[in-house]
UniProtKB/Swiss-Prot annotation:
Family stated for the protein in its record: Belongs to the bacterial ribosomal protein bL9 family.
Name listed for the protein in its UniProt record: Large ribosomal subunit protein bL9c
Annotated localization: Plastid, Chloroplast
Function, as annotated: Binds to the 23S rRNA.
Record bears the keyword rRNA-binding: yes
Record InterPro entries: Ribosomal_bL9, Ribosomal_bL9/RNase_H1_N, Ribosomal_bL9_bac/chp, Ribosomal_bL9_C, Ribosomal_bL9_C_sf, Ribosomal_bL9_N, Ribosomal_bL9_N_sf
GO biological process, one term: translation
GO molecular function: rRNA binding; structural constituent of ribosome
């Protein structure tokens, strides 16, 4: 006896099946007895499939738009290339505390008016005066490399 298969639209992410709003083929019994009663999916009608195509096209346009913005931000940051921050120093070139992602994000915002989430900034441990390479993840496969000049704070 062969399995009967039905198309459903997922309403939430289901491991090993798909993500929310995906159209997937599942066994009729699985859909009728588990997915639909638990409001995890609904039967894919012609209208729903058309709506899914429209949703996918809009999502694709948003991704393209976000990637273009990320590339523009990358160009802007790499044109400036070097950002500076002043920190209080102790003995020699050692600074008090360290430079954080939040501080770098604030410097970039003040300089370029571009808001970058601190979680997307990858920095080495900065404890001394000097020049450091910073990597900023802007989008999938779009990163900007900048330099951060840590200077002693003048009194």
């Amino acid at each position: 006896m062969s399995k009967k298969i039905i198309q459903v639209v997922l309403k939430e992410n289901i491991q090993k099946l798909g993500k929310s709003n995906d159209v997937v083929k599942v066994a009729t019994g699985y859909a009728r007895n588990f997915l639909i009663p638990n409001k995890m999916a609904s039967v894919a009608t012609v209208g729903m499939l058309n709506q899914q195509k429209l949703y996918a096209a809009i999502k694709e346009k948003k991704i393209i738009f976000a990637k273009e913005n990320a590339r523009k931000t990358q160009q802007l940051l790499e044109e400036i290339q070097k950002f500076s921050i002043s920190k209080k120093t102790g003995d020699g070139e050692t600074i008090f505390g360290s430079v954080t992602e939040k501080e770098i994000s604030q410097i970039i915002k003040n300089t370029t008016n571009v808001d970058i989430d601190k979680q997307n900034i990858l920095i080495p441990e900065i404890k001394t005066i000097g020049l450091y390479n910073i990597e900023i993840k802007l989008f999938n496969q779009v990163t900007a490399n900048i330099q951060l000049q840590v200077l002693p704070e003048s009194n």
